[in-house]
């Protein structure tokens, strides 16, 4: 039997799994989960409030934005996808490599920028999502054969 989880519980659990610990915040990284922090406080032009964020000061690095819902919500609903995409749009003003995660405690959809991609069926540590942008090596021998 699936146990109902409030959005607060889902957000807190997701923050722990992803490793979005506020104590890791530094001069080179904005990181955390919450419901009070606005994008404006994170250096963007919006009063919207993300559920979770990983925002390196190096804008060439991968940024992660988390949108959580309670466990009864269908994360494939267009309104939730649009909410995540709106948050991706906000941070895309500074970052070109963005992972957007939509999560309800049981189901997960992951977007590389705004493209839905196949990933692990359970939420992973942030490094897993950062690695989605690693360059694939080119096999020159295969190309020229």
PLM regions: where:
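A short, conserved, highly charged catalytic patch centered on acidic carboxylates
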Residues: 1-99, 107-144
């Amino acid at each position: 039997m699936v146990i109902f989880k409030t959005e607060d519980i889902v957000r807190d659990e997701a923050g722990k799994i992803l490793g979005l610990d506020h104590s890791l915040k530094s001069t080179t990284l904005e990181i955390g989960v919450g419901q009070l922090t606005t994008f404006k406080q994170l250096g963007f032009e919006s009063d919207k409030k993300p559920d979770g964020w990983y925002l390196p000061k190096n804008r060439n690095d991968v940024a992660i934005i988390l949108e959580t819902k309670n466990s009864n919500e269908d994360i494939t609903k267009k309104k939730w996808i649009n909410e995540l995409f709106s948050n991706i749009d906000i941070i895309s003003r500074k970052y070109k490599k963005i992972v957007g995660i939509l999560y309800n405690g049981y189901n997960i959809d992951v977007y590389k920028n705004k493209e839905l991609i196949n990933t692990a069926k359970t939420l992973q540590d942030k490094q897993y999502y950062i690695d989605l942008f690693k360059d694939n090596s080119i096999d020159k021998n295969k190309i020229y054969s």
